[in-house]
Amino acid sequence: MKKFLIAILLLILILAGVASFSYYKMTEFVKTPVNVQADELLTIERGTTSSKLATLFEQEKLIADGKLLPYLLKLKPELNKIKAGTYSLENVKTVQDLLDLLNSGKEVQFNVKWIEGKTFKDWRKDLENAPHLVQTLKDKSNEEIFALLDLPDIGQNLELKNVEGWLYPDTYNYTPKSTDLELLKRSAERMKKALNKAWNERDEDLPLANPYEMLILASIVEKETGIANERAKVASVFINRLKAKMKLQTDPTVIYGMGENYNGNIRKKDLETKTPYNTYVIDGLPPTPIAMPSESSLQAVANPEKTDFYYFVADGSGGHKFTRNLNEHNKAVQEYLRWYRSQKNAK
């Protein structure tokens, strides 16, 4: 009986020693430095087991030997709540850091910045150049993308199927495996809400038949001025001209209508050439927006300043001088030309 008890005691001591040694090895293992390259990303697929994770760590050369990892995750189940995704290893120093990151679910974020006043053509280039974004639209026409975005019928000639103006300018974050269409849908939803809000809060006497006309005019205001406190005044000029049945005569629409033929200059011939967008020739608004307007431009059109201005011209300081009639406008143009020549001669 005594020998049996001694054997049991020895076995307990051995097991305790093994457990203690194993715990020590696990403690040391989590301190193992991880070999991380600059800007390295690690993708964990859904359903990855602890043994597959160990193999992945070895294949990615993060650690030399991963055989202890499955045992560690059994010993510390709180570390085995790993979430699928793609992670930046920028701040990972040890195995413990790596496991903490994978358990956090904090995937790496990328972003694409879409600027107000740019066109859908510009934004498509931004999408195509966005890193780690799944490209599903590269071979799609603008008309096909229009259909995929499920845009509302609020006055637009749907035969045109033009995405222009329908996307909300902002910085959009995304994770790897996100698609370009997902980003466009997020942007389109925000623009729908912003446009609906502006339309519902608009002045009652606006000469605009529907929200789409508001979107068109907001895009023109966006292109005409980058100064926030000028937008409502610029909008008032166009609203006044529409009410008076005057042509809008705004250069950005001419440029948009010229497309690839625009080389940085507008000639008299260009102002006289009829295109759907040449507001020196056509009456009223062009058929579609000419750029992506900001929400502040939408609000400026919805609630323009109450003015009797019908003209404006650059004032040389980045802003504009607003005038009531053609005579005042011509004088303002001459003032600007004198300023321009003086600046040119000073160089």
From Swiss-Prot:
Keyword field: Cell inner membrane, Cell membrane, Cell wall biogenesis/degradation, Lyase, Membrane, Transmembrane, Transmembrane helix
A GO BP entry: peptidoglycan biosynthetic process
One of the Pfam families matching this protein, by short name: YceG
Record carries keyword 4Fe-4S: no
Compartments (UniProt record): Cell inner membrane
Function (record text): Functions as a peptidoglycan terminase that cleaves nascent peptidoglycan strands endolytically to terminate their elongation.
Protein name in UniProt: Endolytic murein transglycosylase
Lineage: Bacteria, Pseudomonadati, Pseudomonadota, Gammaproteobacteria, Pasteurellales
